[in-house]
Amino acid sequence: VVYELVERRVLVRDLEVGMYICRLDRSWHETPFPLQGLAVHSDADIEAVGRYCEYVFVDTQRDVAADIRPQVLRRTEPSPVRFRRSQVYQDTARFDDELARAGEAFDNASACMEEIVDAIVQGQVLDIEVVARAVRPMVDSVMRSGDAFFWIESLRRRDIYTYQHAVSCSALAAAFGRHMGFDQETIVSLAAGNLLMDVGKSQLPDELLLRAGPLDAQEMALARLHVEEGLGILAHSGVMDVDVRDIVGSHHERFDGGGYPQGLAGAAIPLAARMAAIIDTYDALCTPRPYREAVSRHHALREIYAGRDSAFQGELVEQFQSCLGVYPTGSLVELTSGEIAIVMVQNHARRLLPRVAVLTTREKAPLDDFRIVDLMRQVGHEHVEVGRSLPPGSHGIDPKEFFLQ
């Protein structure tokens, strides 16, 4: 289906009285303006829009102004996202104190996701209360200490990709929303949407989902139906949350218009879905599949960064990288001393000096027990920092063997 848009992109400085704004360069929820649109009645209206946006889309069918100067957005040109944090969150729990609650929240979310999929397969409606039970403890844990939750998540990755991917994406959405300064209810909606974004896959054949190799064109077309199926499940279940619906319906859209199902581009893609596209791709890269190995979290961030201003909105990519850090929690790294370690807690002031668990000697021989080192609090003459990221399984090391005994 081809949709003919009646919108024109206009820089705020080129707005004129009489124009009707139907879409912003960000979510309406980030502004004080009404969700249904905004008529420009005066220069004061233009000034107010300029406090939040660089550009907008005007409805040409409702536009009474003449000589609109359209601006062409090249696919390689960044589109600004000047979000204003409503809140700046601080950790309220120590990493060590939050670990038990983070583990419980992770296990709860995984069990709830399994319950959700089983119910849908049996023809039952999606119970949004089950989704809330899965999401809220996880959001609460991430709000208290994101490092603790992602440490647990890195050690409990399962072979059941659908469940694990859903839970990981949900937690990443909570962390991303926290970093962006969204209010907690919005963060819960983002987490719920990311938990459910692939729920439509429950309606696809198992042999398609478990395929060990690349899909042919016919199989790919069938796989893409999970978006439509997911929206159908939400509608049948009476789920009205706008962010959840936007994420399920548009997380495969791409900023340059190269995604599906509608080929939306730029600000036509809802903000929640633009964020979900980054999250979905990042976690998929970090997760092993039958047809490829997982990449390191650091490498996954580099892959996402390579897609900025094409597949993904550049400013959101930068915010996501800032949220997770150069070497995200759970990353296997080699220190400049030669020792192998895994990142436990971020140091947001000095990204190369996190708190780590050292797993080997300088000669790469496994330690009998790991040693926790805060690289910010080193004593002595040698200054050790993170040297480079390592692929999962490097030097035959499985962190689970150290921490899940």
Protein language model annotation of sequence segments:
Residues 1-126, 380-405:
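Membrane-cytosol interface segments
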Residues 99-405:
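Histidine- and acidic-residue-rich, metal-dependent catalytic cores
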